[in-house]
Amino acid sequence: MNGRIAVAIALGGALGALARFYISGILPVYKDFPVGTLLVNSIASFILGYIYGLLFWGIDVPADWRAFFGTGFCGALSTFSTFSYETFSLLREREYFLAALNISANVIITVSLVFIGFILARR
């Protein structure tokens, strides 16, 4: 890894972490459901799908921009550990329906958004 890539990852990571902090702070929970985490994971999934769609469809995305958005911004914006903790907390509180909804929503929505981003990159 060269220095330019490292700086791109660091800058993207800083912006992604700040975005996650503010988005999750605005929408932390809605009636015990962790909306903020679902939203940040969804945004990051769409962006990653779009970037890798561009690459797949033959559009050159410079390595430093891939590092900035992919590893840096999206890596810091999305959060599997918080999703896991929030799901565990719902289970601990015996909110079984909300825990199942959280798991289902995160998997279905984020995978769908990767697909949508991938397809939109073709246009």
UniProtKB/Swiss-Prot annotation:
The keyword Transmembrane applies. It holds the Pfam family CRCB. InterPro entries: FluC (IPR003691). Na(+) is not transported, but it plays an essential structural role and its presence is essential for fluoride channel function. GO terms for biological process: cellular detoxification of fluoride. GO terms for molecular function: fluoride channel activity; metal ion binding. Disulfide bonds: none annotated. The chain crosses the membrane at residues 7-27, 39-59, 68-88, 100-120. It catalyses: fluoride(in) = fluoride(out). Na(+) binds at G75, S78. It is found in: Cell membrane. Its main location: membrane. Keywords: Cell membrane, Ion channel, Ion transport, Membrane, Metal-binding, Sodium, Transmembrane, Transmembrane helix, Transport. It is a multi-pass membrane protein. GO terms for cellular component: plasma membrane. Belongs to the fluoride channel Fluc/FEX (TC 1.A.43) family. Fluoride-specific ion channel. Important for reducing fluoride concentration in the cell, thus reducing its toxicity. HAMAP family: FluC. This is Fluoride-specific ion channel FluC. It comes from Thermococcus onnurineus (strain NA1).
